[in-house]
């Protein structure tokens, strides 16, 4: 009987902890939302937007969420014209939806995957090849 009561008490405690939406340090965990206005471009006005220029290409990057284990992130990214070869495995599994522009991915075996605005693509972390674009925005 003690075992049943203890198991029930632990179950109630754990479910209450999970359902309360609190972290270990008692912070409330909230969903990360990207609004229609953000998607239309307002997100790039956020104060935490990171702008970088490398070899004449300017990128805008806004991270809206990084998981507590650091293995998952969300946000929006905009890039100008760029072409680069990825000779080492990509390093992360990535899914994204293209809002504007297009990206052409040429795999190491020559297979061409062109993804346009309104389409999505998933890149496995083992992927190598050429990334080519005249510019795009992705979520």
Place the predicted regions along the sequence by residue.
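A short, N-terminal "cap"/entry segment at the start of jelly-roll beta-barrel domains
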Residues: 19-71
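Hydrophobic helical h-region of N-terminal Sec-dependent signal peptides
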Residues: 6-10, 14
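Ligand-binding loop in jelly-roll beta-barrel domains
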Residues: 125-139
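Conserved short histidine dyad/triad with adjacent acidic residue
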Residues: 73-90, 124-125
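Short hydrophobic/aromatic-rich beta-strand segments that constitute the beta-sheet cores
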Residues: 74, 86, 105, 138-139
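Positively charged n-region of N-terminal signal peptides that target proteins for export
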Residues: 1-4
């Amino acid at each position: 009987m003690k075992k049943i009561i203890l198991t029930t008490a632990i179950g109630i405690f754990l479910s209450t902890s999970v359902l309360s939406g609190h972290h270990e340090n008692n912070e409330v965990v909230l969903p990360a939302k990207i609004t229609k206005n953000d998607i239309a471009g307002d997100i790039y006005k956020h104060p935490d937007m990171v702008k970088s220029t490398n070899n004449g290409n300017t990128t805008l990057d806004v991270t809206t969420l990084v998981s507590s284990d650091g293995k998952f992130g969300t946000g929006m990214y905009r890039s100008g014209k760029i072409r680069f070869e990825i000779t080492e495995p990509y390093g992360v599994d990535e899914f994204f939806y293209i809002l504007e522009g297009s990206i052409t991915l040429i795999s190491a075996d020559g297979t061409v995957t062109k993804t346009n605005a309104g389409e999505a693509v998933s890149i496995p972390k083992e992927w190598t090849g050429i990334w080519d674009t005249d510019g795009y925005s992705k979520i």
